[in-house]
């Protein structure tokens, strides 16, 4: 595996973690939203990753070098919490308001995990860059 593959692999991870952070941001932004006129509340989105062999992306001879890609973004189908508040403008006929199914604590943990993974891959790129520069300096 060449050093340039390190950058490509880390870049796939950065892209994937960025999408994960976007989903977390969307989930947290909608954590306290209620069902709309259609009766449907916001559903938390989850990002699923899949291994991506770099040989499949056009790199010859590096079939065992694996990056990552987003395979799917799904909506959590668990029902949102229902609160009895008959005076709320979004209350149904029984006086219940349906909120999103976002668990803010889980989302914060997910955000910390995605952020750390993103930072780790930046560190991988910085280390690879430093090694390449040192290799070039040895040739002088």
Predicted regions and their residues:
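Amphipathic alpha-helical polymerization modules
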Residues: 1-140
């Amino acid at each position: 595996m060449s050093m340039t593959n390190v950058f490509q692999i880390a870049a796939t991870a950065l892209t994937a973690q960025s999408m994960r952070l976007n989903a977390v941001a969307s989930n947290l932004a909608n954590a306290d939203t209620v069902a709309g006129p259609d009766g449907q509340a916001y559903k938390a989105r989850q990002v699923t990753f899949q291994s991506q062999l770099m040989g499949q992306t056009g790199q010859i001879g590096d079939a065992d070098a694996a990056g990552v890609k987003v395979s799917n973004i799904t909506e959590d189908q668990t029902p949102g919490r229902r609160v009895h508040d008959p005076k709320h403008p979004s209350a149904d006929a029984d006086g219940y308001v349906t909120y999103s199914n976002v668990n803010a604590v889980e989302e914060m943990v997910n955000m910390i995990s995605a952020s750390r993974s993103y930072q780790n891959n930046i560190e991988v790129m910085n280390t690879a860059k430093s090694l390449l520069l040192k290799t070039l300096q040895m040739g002088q």
